Amino acid sequence: MALAVRFWCLFPVGRSAAWGLRLPAGAAGSRGQRVPWRLGASEAMGNSGTFKRSLLFSALSYLGFETYQVISQAVLVHAAAKVFEIEEVLEQADYLYESGETEKLYQLLTQYKESEDAELLWRLARASRDVAQLSGTSEEEKKFLVYEALEYAKRALEKNESSCAAHKWYAICIGDVGDYEGIKAKIANAYIIKEHFEKAIELNPKDATSIHLMGIWCYTVAEMPWYQRRIAKVLFATPPGSTYEEALGYFHRAEQVDPNFYSKNLLLLGKTYLKLHNKKLAAFWLTKAKDYPAHTEEDKQIQTEAAQLLRGFSDKN
């Protein structure tokens, strides 16, 4: 990160600049030789006062500059230390996330909840949401965490509108809040969610998670119940629309960008093929989801769902 720029050119540099008193014109003789510059007593006394004032002004200017240097250096050191601290916290946060230490991660990041760093804030939004999804979290706590996550994501986006992750987590958190605000709000939010997922993909076309989430948006809209579609048509001139084929395209695209990056992408590939009545490919992707190593609570839930869907195949056959 860039540090503050020091404007040295605005101040005198060194003692020579601070004490640079100029001799009057005519102090040299007609041939360029130096000659004594004799003054009368009263003139000498006047120049003595002027000299003292000039000396005092120069001294104060110099002291002021020295003070400015000390303060500037202190500010720079503090800023550098703060940047280093944030970078260190982000490294710890990423390690805890990869280790599946959901609650420890949340406890770490909430210590910095007043931060103005977008990278820290979107991670805090993600951590709040992950704690909300833990099986031991009560419904009351879950609702609080969901709204808390949205607030952190919103702040992250305000701090950096060019952040792919900030757009992504803002969209995710809006979707979560919709579960508490009714059908009308949920349908209205669908447009906002799509906009932010598309922006995240635009900012980083190699982010498999954003592509996957756009696939979820398409899948969710495609399976929207008839009564929700009717409400959408009444409330909006052009209600949100999509197809399972479109969803499938995003899920495959995410897999191409980063193979096996997420158990839920494997599960949804299987479920989408089921919607399209392709049981062979559905079984292939559901088996991959069932066999995916469980690192998180969500991975375990996905393993269970994939196994149940596969058993449904066996029972029918």
From Swiss-Prot:
Q: Where is this protein found? A: Cytoplasm, Cytoskeleton; Cytoplasm, Cytoskeleton, Spindle; Cytoplasm, Cytoskeleton, Spindle pole
Return any one Pfam family short name: RMD1-3
Q: Which domain of life does the UniProt lineage start with? A: Eukaryota
- GO cellular component terms listed in the entry, alphabetical order: cytoplasm; mitochondrion; mitotic spindle pole; spindle microtubule
Which UniProt keywords are listed? Cytoplasm, Cytoskeleton, Microtubule, Repeat, TPR repeat
The reply to whether Cell membrane figures as a keyword in the UniProt entry is no
The family database entries (SUPFAM superfamilies) matched by this protein are listed as:
TPR-like
Matches recorded under InterPro entries? RMD1-3_a_helical_rpt, TPR-like_helical_dom_sf
TPR repeats by residue range: 171-207, 225-261
- GO molecular-function terms, A-Z: microtubule binding
Residues that bear N6-succinyllysine: K168
Entry's family note: Belongs to the RMDN family.
Q: How does it assemble?
A: Interacts with microtubules.
The name of this protein is Regulator of microtubule dynamics protein 1
Question: From which organism does this entry originate?
Answer: Bos taurus
